Amino acid sequence: AETYDVIVTPKDEAYTIFAQSMDRTGFARGTLAARAGMMAAVPALDKPEPLTMGDMMGDMSGAMGAMDHSMHAGMAAAGASTRVRHARTEYGPSVDMRVDTPRTNLDDPGIGLRNNGRRVLTYADLHTVGGPMDKRGAGREIELHLTGNMERYTWSIDGLEFGKSTPVHFRHNERLRVILHNDTMMTHPMHMHGLWSELETPDGRFQVRKHTLNVQPAQRISFLVTADALGRWAWHCHLMYHMDAGMFREVVVA
C-alpha cells in the first residue's frame, strides 16, 4: 500500500522493475524504457526463507528465548526503556500476546530482507524535503495497539475488531501525535484515509510524510497528524485479509 516517488535519469536501455511476494511464490514486473518494445532481464526469485521467532519479533536480541507462546506476556525488547500500558480490552480472546517493551528503531529492513546481501530501503533512509507541512507541535496524544489472535485468525485494534469498536475522534484542525504499538508477530501497513501521517524518529524529530505506515512486529512508532479534512475516514491495515478480519477503525474529524 505504500507509494514512492523515484527520480531517475535513465540511459538508452531498458530497466526491469521487479517486486516479489513475501513467500516467493510469485512476482510482478514492469519495464522502464526509452521506447516501446525494449526489454530487460528479469531476476530470479529469491529462495523462500522459513520465518523464525526472531524474524517475526524483529530481532529482539535474544529476548524471546524464554517465551512460551501460550503465555504471550512480558516480552522484553533490547534498547527499549519505557513500559507501556495495555487497554483492558486487550485482555480477552481476541488477543494472544502483548509486547510490554517494544523496539522503536526505524532501520530494520524487515522480515525476509535482513542480511540478504542487498541494500534495503528503510524508513531511516527516508527524509521528506521541506520538513513537516504543519510546524505546530502535538496538542495531545492518542495511543493504539495493533492486536490479534493468530490461532483464531482475528485482527483488531486495542483488542476490538471493527464491529465492536467506536470511532476515533480528531478535532478539526488540531495537531496531534498518534502512537501505534504492534502487539503481534505480523507486519501491519496502516493506512489512514484523508490525512497525512508524518513519521517521527524515536527522539521525536520529523522523518517522512506518508499515507501508509508499515509497523513491524513488536515495534512502536509515532507520527503527527493535522486533522484538516472534515469527515469520516477509514483507518485500517492494508493487508486486506487483516482489514476484513477486524483491524479497521473509523476516524471522525469534526
PLM regions: where:
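Short strand-edge motifs at loop-to-beta-strand transitions and within beta-strands
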Residues: 2-6, 211, 219-223
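Short, surface-exposed beta-strand-loop junctions and turns on beta-sheet-rich folds
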Residues: 23-25, 185, 196-198
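Divalent metal-coordination and catalytic microenvironments
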Residues: 1, 144, 178, 193, ...
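Histidine-centered divalent metal-coordination motifs
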Residues: 18, 188-195, 236-242
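Intrinsic, low-complexity N-terminal interaction/targeting segments
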Residues: 157, 166-168, 189-192, 196-213, ...
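Extended terminal and domain-junction accessory segments
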Residues: 2-175, 228-232, 240-254
